[in-house]
Swiss-Prot record:
This is Probable cytosol aminopeptidase. GO terms for molecular function: manganese ion binding; metalloaminopeptidase activity. Belongs to the peptidase M17 family. It comes from Sodalis glossinidius (strain morsitans). Mn(2+) 1 binds at residues 275, 352, 354. The gene is pepA.
Length: 503
């Protein structure tokens, strides 16, 4: 789908469709008023008849409006004018894209980007429109024998901006939005792939292909079980020893900074391509969704793709910690004591708390990069879902400025996160009689104690942990990976470069 920006008046547009907003109750937006004026009150007359109230998401498609050059006008309800916020704006864009796609409008000029959204500028409105449009049209049908496609799908979208001086900002917003949307799609495609296809070797192959596609700035190396054993990554190895699929850790290095020696930002993604729980086996209900336990790695993959697409002037290392937690006679057991790469020992009380065992060795491994910051991303705890539901990503950090930076990026991107505490009183729950620590700390504060566990392996750098157990995928009729938090981390990186669209 093609996106562009322009600045022009609605009456001069020759297009299959013009999209304008209507506020509640039956109030035309300024652009809709212009169209109403040149059509001699045609639109306002329809509203007075009760054809459209203006509630969020309501639509009315008009054909051959008098004196209007475009074939059709789509009126879209935007709610109350003073209450139009970012969430409602995205809902309006989503409904617009679906309506255009379903009604055969192959191209459209959209004036919704001229609406006032509280606290948001033109760059944000255009970028979010692009990202939302791509999200709305996303399908995962690679494995279906019969693919259903619209007869006349939407192919071109033009976003109008109020003034010509905002064209540059709008064009930058499209560029950023397309790159972020591509990263989100890549993460969703990986997450939605079934575990008989997407195993650790598949993750590694995708990492290699990513490096091959972006030339000299990017390299990938894959660390297998033999090298892990030589390094002493015994916690990581233990998790995968019950699986027929070899554990593989893919390390993607992107060097985009003009200073080749600049310290990198390191992203570490949990990549459990299937998590049966091991000996502490999960219940059968919804176990199929444990293919999504690699969405942390999928996120890192998507963010790396975004950074390469935009040639961000940063050095970034992305780690996809691929593994599979299965049950057989070789599987690790509750009661085992593991010596991690850091030298610290861990008593395994529950084999279904395996993600932190993989991550702890990965977090120690990345010390060699002398990172500026390290951010790990993981579908780590059901406790985080209980605490924050499916709307907010959980965040813990050992560095207040980094935590504030991430929360700010999350708010900017509309991919929200909430910081959880990281205190000594929670660390006490991890005490073990037989090792330096246990791998679980009981039910109370489970998302926090998981973060406390990881913090013990991140003492040598500024670190943050994102628990995406509640936000990485949806269940039910809309089942599928969400691609979160690619948008948040992309915004974080854009902010680091100064290319964040602030005006």
């Amino acid at each position: 789908m093609e996106f562009s920006v322009k600045s022009g008046s609605p009456e001069k547009q020759r297009s299959a469709c013009i999209v304008v907003g209507v506020f509640e109750p039956r109030r035309l937006s300024p652009i809709a008023e212009q169209l109403d004026k040149i059509s001699d009150g045609y639109i306002s007359t329809l509203l007075r008849r009760g054809e459209l109230e203006g509630k969020v998401g309501q639509t009315l498609l008009l054909h051959h409006v008098p004196n209007v050059l475009s074939e059709r006008i789509l009126l879209i309800g935007c709610g109350k004018e003073r209450e139009l916020d970012e969430r409602q704006y995205k809902q309006v864009i989503n409904k617009t894209i679906n309506t255009l796609n379903d009604t055969g409008s192959m191209e459209a000029v959209c004036f919704l980007t001229e609406l006032h959204v509280k606290g948001r500028n033109t760059y944000w409105k255009v970028r979010q429109a692009v990202e939302t449009a791509k999200e709305t049209l996303y399908t995962f049908d690679q494995l279906k024998s019969n693919k259903i496609e619209p007869r006349r799908p939407l192919r071109k979208m033009v976003f109008n901006v109020p003034t010509r001086r905002e064209l540059t900002s709008g064009e930058r917003a499209i560029s950023h939005g397309l790159a972020i949307a591509a990263g989100i799609k890549a993460a969703k495609d990986l997450g939605n792939m079934p575990p008989n296809i997407c195993n650790p070797a598949y993750l590694a192959s995708q990492a290699r292909q990513l490096a091959d596609g972006y030339g000299k700035t990017t390299t990938t190396r894959v660390i297998g079980e033999q090298q892990m054993k030589e390094l002493g990554m015994n916690a990581y190895l233990a998790v995968g020893q019950g699986s027929a699929n070899e554990s593989l850790m893919s390390v993607i290095e992107y060097k985009g900074s003009p200073d080749a020696d600049a310290r990198p930002i390191v992203l570490v993604g949990k990549g459990l391509t299937f998590d049966a729980g091991g000996i502490s086996i999960k219940p059968a209900d919804s176990m199929d969704e444990m293919k999504y336990d690699m969405c942390g790695a999928a996120t890192v993959y998507g963010v790396m793709r975004m950074a390469m697409e935009l040639n961000l002037p940063l050095n970034i290392v992305g780690v996809l910690a691929g593994c599979e937690n299965m049950v057989d006679g070789r599987a690790f057991r509750p009661g085992d004591v593991l010596t991690t790469l850091s030298g610290q020992t861990v008593e395994v009380l529950n084999t279904d708390a395996e993600g932190r065992l993989v991550l702890c060795d990965a977090l120690t491994y990345v010390e060699r990069f002398e990172p500026e910051v390290v951010i790990d991303v993981a579908t780590l705890t059901g406790a985080c879902v209980i605490a924050l539901g499916h709307h907010l990503t959980g965040l813990v950090s050992n560095h207040n400025p980094l935590a504030h930076e991430l929360i700010g990026a999350a708010e900017q991107a509309g991919d929200r996160a909430w910081r959880l505490p990281l205190g000594d009183e929670f660390q006490e729950q991890l005490e073990s009689n037989f090792a330096d620590m246990a791998n679980i700390g009981g039910r109370p504060g489970g998302a926090i104690t998981a973060g406390c566990f990881l913090s013990r392996f991140a003492r040598k750098y500024n670190w943050a942990h994102l628990d995406i157990a509640g936000t990485a995928w949806r269940s039910g009729k809309a089942k599928g990976a969400t691609g979160r938090p690619v948008a948040m981390l992309s915004q974080f990186l854009l902010n680091r470069t100064g290319l964040n669209g602030d005006e």
